[in-house]
C-alpha cells in the first residue's frame, strides 16, 4: 500500500484532483524531485537539432535485400541483433527516406511498449524504422548526446 501526505498547494494547480492515484504517481513524485534540483533546467526540445515522428504508412514488404531496405519495428530497436530479415520495398522507401535511421540519433518507442530508449550506432544506419518511434537528433553544442540519452533512459526521463 502506498501512502503520502499532500497539502492544498499540491491540489490547487492540478484541477482540484483528490484521487490518490494521481498524487501517488511516480511521475508526479519525480517531477517534484526535478523541481527541487538546484541546477539549471532546460527543455528537451531546446537541446536538439530536430525531434520528429513519422507519418502512418502501409508497408510493402519484399523478400530480399536486393529489392528492399532493412525494416525495423519499434520492438526491434532493443534487440542485440537488429537484422530481422524484413525488407521494405525500395520503391516505397524513397517516399519514406526521412524515416531512415542515422548514427547518433536517439529513438523512443511511442506505441505498444512505450518509453524504450535506444541510442543508434552504425548498425542502425540505412535501416528504415516504423512511424512508432520518436526520433531525436541531438545537438552536441547544447548538450552532449550521451548525457541526453542517459537522462531519457533514467526513471526521471521516462516520466517526462
Please describe what each predicted stretch is.
Residues 68:
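Short aromatic-glycine-enriched beta-strand elements
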Residues 73, 93-152:
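A short beta-sheet element
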Residues 41-44, 127, 145, 158:
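Alpha-helix initiation and N-capping motif
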Residues 1-58:
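Non-catalytic DNA-recognition/assembly elements of restriction-modification systems
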Residues 41-60, 75-103:
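Sequence-specific dsDNA recognition surfaces
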Residues 154-160:
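Specificity-determining recognition surfaces
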Residues 4-5, 55-62, 74, 120-123:
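Intrinsically disordered, low-complexity boundary segments flanking structured domains
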